[in-house]
Curated annotation (Swiss-Prot):
Belongs to the CarB family. The keyword ATP-binding applies. It comes from Thermus thermophilus (strain ATCC BAA-163 / DSM 7039 / HB27). It is an enzyme of class 6 (ligase). Keywords: Amino-acid biosynthesis, Arginine biosynthesis, ATP-binding, Ligase, Magnesium, Manganese, Metal-binding, Nucleotide-binding, Pyrimidine biosynthesis, Repeat. Mg(2+) 4 binds at E837, N839. Mg(2+) 3 binds at Q825, E837. The lineage of its organism: Bacteria, Thermotogati, Deinococcota, Deinococci, Thermales. This is Carbamoyl phosphate synthase large chain. Mn(2+) 2 binds at E299, N301.
Length: 1028
């Protein structure tokens, strides 16, 4: 069937800021779909409020709108662009809910826009819990007994009938938001009231519990001709009761019998047909009772999902790309498989390896905060809480598991020092469970006992036991020949771990292994278990005999990715590495990407010339460098993860491209940087470095309180705090510093109260420096720069101070010898400027600044790293200032951490960001707020909590707002961590926790009242910017 030529222009809705449950996987799938549709001759309009994405690059879609994802702005875009169709299945839950709202409000019909990929009825059947259960009954498939309820009373009535525990699943929410498990009536009242509030349609499914059952997923695709293919099966290592996004998962499924698998496949095909997903992909989840084999259907996502990104990376089958092409009328048998070029997309992938995904969490960021429910528990439930994930590929489950664990950048023996009885308490679902299980296996706990405590299938527990037994044997039987070495390395044991077991250093073990010629070989991900030749170089390491990867003789560059997304190191760094790959490819280099994150564009098989899906450890990276022999490695674009490898790589004789390691070290080493600033005459706040808690207490009075204290070498403000007296400092040293594994030195800085903070991104070639963007923070000093709203260009900083900022930035860049990007943070008090820190690497603001000024900074940085100058790259304007304002606001997933009271401080907690652009700074800020989900009211009631707020109250009253002391408000302003803030979070109401935020918000509200709505594409904004 030829593609539809009646459609010319297609609108794609992105998923908005990155948050828990909706991360970089939608940037990956959206980017793939835009490229596919444009390649097929369609015009594509994209709307997304998230600037930190590849999909919002102005070169990708024909028209790109960085606008809030709400009905008003979308209607404005529909009116302006007049697309023929809307593809709603690529923007996660946000995109799907918006598409449904546009349809239900009659807005799509008004502008004659057709929904393609999934019709409204199919979305409703897949997403509405009751409709889905009815559909399953029609095709004789079992679902857990459940009832859709609209009130707590109905829920209690049903739970009394089926018995506790019950599971609560709110309708149309993301990552299980608002859901949970209730073990008794009191818990049901709590979970269900929250779930009903958070569901956009205020309903939730209460269903019988299948806790402890095995959980499986199938990724399914269907075309117009009713061809249905199963892309892969995925098995959750953690049993039912843990959200699949928080489970360790493995593909293909390991413990299903052939009969069970065939039954599941038949069910999946029947489901996608019954729900009516005419074209595209769906993810269908099943539970299997391990005792009886009873199989029930849990739910489906009639869209591209987190699991489809994982399935794409696990198999090499580009689900989002194919889904986009099916939506415009192609059939599966008409689309070629990019990897083999011989087989069509209707051939189901076959894989001869095992893939393991492990989630990454951030409980430690939220635990120190006040909580209305007591201490924050790290228990994993049906509500997703992980912020990122790592994927690894091996020939066996054991090898893939161990590679994935080291990809998390955490010691496999993290719990070695914990007492056995404490470990036994860590067997409930929590981020440490896999470490506790392995540690207890080392201490001889039987598999059966572990199974009873965890309900993890005994097959997985036996696999872990075999790893532990091999480690034990190794202690007394060192490897003596190649076979021994290959056996131990094939289990996924690192040189470092083998060294620990034998009492040797990592370098010594590496030398012994290499002397015997034992090095990894590289295999290819080819979708067909080596039945056809693979043309797309997508590789993983293993310790076998046959190598499938032959390095070319071309000049090549290795770019190190950033590993799993976490708070402080988000998709912004993936953006920088992808841009570097594209720029170096255009310049004629062969590009080699090393990364372990399945959610991202960097690990798409067609981003770099070669992709190594490997953990970012020194051992794994050195193996690749020795195999490929590149001209050098770029380690400064992926955040702290690759930066930590820079020293080891340089010591091993690897050439680091761009900024030399000496410059990185000089900027990060506190004393060296202080000496440099003194030499250059650049002021810094008073500060000292202590090597121990005792020294910190002695030096503190010399610097003077209040102090900003933190360990050296951290990202995202980990363990950073403002302390106001000696008592607070003592508490910090005992509660925050003492538990740190590495015991780094302690930095004590004088805290400048009331200063305006600035963030500066610059680009240097060693001779000239481009000061690309100066951003003013809305929140004052003391709030982590990654959690502050920012404006570019600054609004409240005197020109005299800005001149100093440019001058200091240039001097720092040239003296440090930066070749590439540099981020500097300043504090401004009046016209005085103090430098806080400098980081000679890509920062998290690079995508935002690039979008704001229309200059691809990361691309230029990569070309400078291989020897180009700013002049040669055509950069003329070294101080670009756009003739409009760009604002950035952050998103913090407060809702996912029960009871936590929102509070901003020096430790970063945001997961994502939104952007607003306007001629007026306050309107840009208003748009950024809307884009981040903070719907500031234009009128209504405001409640204030805290002392000394008379001036703000007067301003809000003057603007026509009524003040209230009650619960019925439209906006909450609380400058103290009050439990009312938690209630606002759970009711989805806007709230503000800083004086500056309250002031900016009021200015924004006043401007928004006057001006009404304006939408404009990024391409149009860039027309106005002076071309660098």
């Amino acid at each position: 069937m030829p593609p539809r030529r009646d459609l010319k222009k297609i609108l794609i809705i992105g998923s908005g800021p990155i948050t828990i449950g909706q991360a970089a996987e939608f940037d990956y799938s959206g980017t793939q779909a835009v490229k596919a549709l444009r390649g097929a001759g369609y015009r594509v309009v994209l709307v997304n409020s998230n600037p930190a994405t590849i999909m919002t690059d102005p070169e990708l879609a024909e028209r790109t709108y960085i606008e809030p994802l709400d009905l008003e702005h979308l209607e404005g875009i529909l009116a302006r662009e007049a697309p023929d169709a809307l593809l709603p299945t690529l923007g996660g839950q946000t995109g799907l809910n918006l598409a449904m709202a546009l349809y239900e409000e009659g807005i799509l019909q008004k502008y004659g826009v057709e929904l393609i990929g999934a019709k409204a009825e199919a979305i409703r059947k897949g997403e509405d819990r009751e409709a889905f259960q009815e559909a399953m009954r029609r095709i004789d498939l079992e679902v857990p007994r459940g009832q859709l309820v609209g009130s707590v009373e109905e829920g209690l009535h049903f739970a009394r009938e089926v018995g506790f525990p019950v599971v609560v699943r709110p309708s149309f929410t993301l990552g299980g938001t608002g859901g949970g498990i209730a073990h008794d009536e009191a818990e049901l009242v709590e979970v269900l009231s929250r779930g009903l509030t958070l569901s956009p349609v205020h309903t939730a499914l209460v269903e019988e519990s299948v806790l402890g059952w095995k959980e499986f997923e199938l990724e399914v695709m269907r075309d117009h001709a009713d061809t249905v293919v199963i892309i892969t099966s995925i098995e959750n290592v953690d049993p039912m009761g843990v959200h699949t996004g928080d489970s360790i998962t493995v593909a293909p499924a390991q413990t299903l019998s052939d009969v069970e698998y065939q039954r599941m496949r038949d069910a999946a095909k029947a489901i996608i047909r019954e729900i009516g997903v005419e074209t595209g992909g769906s993810n269908i989840q099943f539970a299997v009772d391990p005792k009886t084999g009873r199989q029930v259907v849990i739910e489906m996502n009639p869209r591209v999902s987190r699991s489809s990104a994982l399935a794409s990376k696990a198999t090499g089958f580009p689900i989002a790309k194919i889904a986009a092409l099916l939506a415009v009328g192609y059939r599966l048998d008409e689309l070629p498989n990019d990897i083999t070029r011989k087989t069509p997309a209707s051939f189901e992938p076959t894989i001869d390896y095992v893939v393991v995904k492990i989630p990454r969490f951030a409980f430690e960021k939220f635990r120190p905060l006040r909580n209305t429910l007591g201490e924050l528990k790290d228990e994993l439930t049906t509500q997703m809480k992980s912020v990122g994930e790592v994927m690894a590929i091996g020939r066996t489950f054991k090898e893939a598991l161990m590679k994935a664990l080291r990809g998390l950048e955490r010691d496999v023996r993290a719990l070695a020092g914990v007492r056995t009885e404490e470990l036994e308490k860590k067997l409930y679902p929590n981020p440490d469970r896999v470490y506790a299980v392995m540690e207890l296996l080392r201490r001889g706990m039987p598999v059966e006992e572990l199974y009873q405590a965890t309900r993890i299938d005994p097959w997985f527990l036996h696999q872990m036991k075999e790893i532990v037994e091999a480690e034990e044997w190794l202690k007394t039987h060192p490897p003596k020949d190649r076979e021994d070495w290959r056996f131990y390395k094939g289990l996924g044991l690192t040189d470092r771990r083998i060294g620990e077991l034998l009492g040797k250093g990592e370098k010594e073990v590496r030398a012994e292994r290499k002397a015997l010629g034992v090095v990894p070989v590289y295999k290819t991900v080819d979708t067909c278990a080596a039945e056809f030749e693979a043309y797309t170089p997508y590789h993983y390491s293993t310790y076998e005999l046959e190598d499938e990867v032959w390095p070319s003789q071309k000049p090549k560059v290795v770019i190190l990715g950033s590993g799993p997304i976490r708070i402080g190191q988000g998709v912004e760094f993936d953006y920088a590495t992808v841009h570097a790959v594209w720029a170096l490819k255009e310049a004629g280099f062969e590009t080699i990407m090393v990364n372990s994150n399945p959610e991202t564009v960097s690990t798409d098989y067609d981003t770099a010339d070669r992709l190594y899906f490997e953990p970012l450890t020194l051992e794994d990276v050195l193996n690749i460098v020795e195999h490929e022999k590149p001209i050098g490695v770029i380690a400064t674009l992926g955040g702290q993860t690759p930066l930590k490898l820079a020293k080891g790589l340089e010591e091993a004789g690897v050439r680091l491209l761009g900024t030399p390691f000496s410059a990185i070290h000089q900027a990060e080493d506190r004393e060296a940087f202080h000496a440099l600033c003194q030499r250059l005459g650049i002021p810094q706040p008073e500060g000292r470095v202590a090597q121990s808690p005792e020294e910190a207490l002695r030096l503190a009075p010399e610097v003077g309180f209040p102090l900003l204290v933190r360990p050296s070498y951290v990202l995202g403000g980990r363990a950073m705090q403002v302390v106001r007296d000696e008592g607070e400092l003592k508490r910090y040293l005992e509660e925050v510093y003492a538990p740190l594994e590495e015991r780094p030195s302690i930095l004590l800085d004088r805290f400048l109260e009331g200063a305006i903070e600035l963030d500066v991104d610059a680009l240097s070639d060693g001779q000239e420096v481009m000061v690309a963007g100066i951003m003013e923070h809305v929140e004052r000093a003391g709030v982590h720069s990654g959690d502050s709203a920012t404006l570019l260009p600054p609004v409240h900083v005197p020109e005299e101070a800005l001149k100093k900022v440019r001058d200091y930035t240039r001097r720092l860049a040239l003296t440090l010898g930066v070749r590439g990007l540099l981020n500097v943070q300043y504090a401004v008090v009046g016209e005085e400027v103090y430098v806080l820190e400098a980081n000679p690497r890509a920062s998290r603001t690079v995508p935002f600044v690039s979008k704001a000024i229309g200059v691809p900074l990361a691309k230029l940085a990569a070309l400078i790293a291989v020897g180009k100058t700013l002049k040669e790259l055509g950069v003329r304007d070294l101080d670009p200032v756009p003739p409009y304002y760009a604002a950035k606001e952050v998103v913090i997933p407060w809702i996912k951490f029960p009871g936590v009271i929102p509070e901003l401080g020096p430790e970063m907690r945001s997961t994502g960001e939104s952007m607003g652009i306007d001629q007026d700074p306050y309107l840009a800020y208003y748009k950024a707020e809307l884009g981040a989900g903070q719907r500031l009211p234009l009128s209504g009631q405001v409640r204030f909590i805290g002392e000394g707020l008379e001036d703000l109250k007067a301003l809000y009253q003057e603007a026509g707002f009524a003040l209230t002391e009650g619960q019925d408000y439209d906006l909450l302003i609380s400058l103290v961590p009050d439990p009312e803030l938690r209630r606002a979070v759970e009711r989805g109401l806007p709230f503000i926790t800083t004086r500056e935020g309250a002031w900016w918000s009021l200015k924004a509200i006043l401007r928004a009242r006057e001006s009404g709505l304006r939408v404009q594409s990024l391409q149009d904004w860039h027309q106005k910017a002076p071309r660098g």
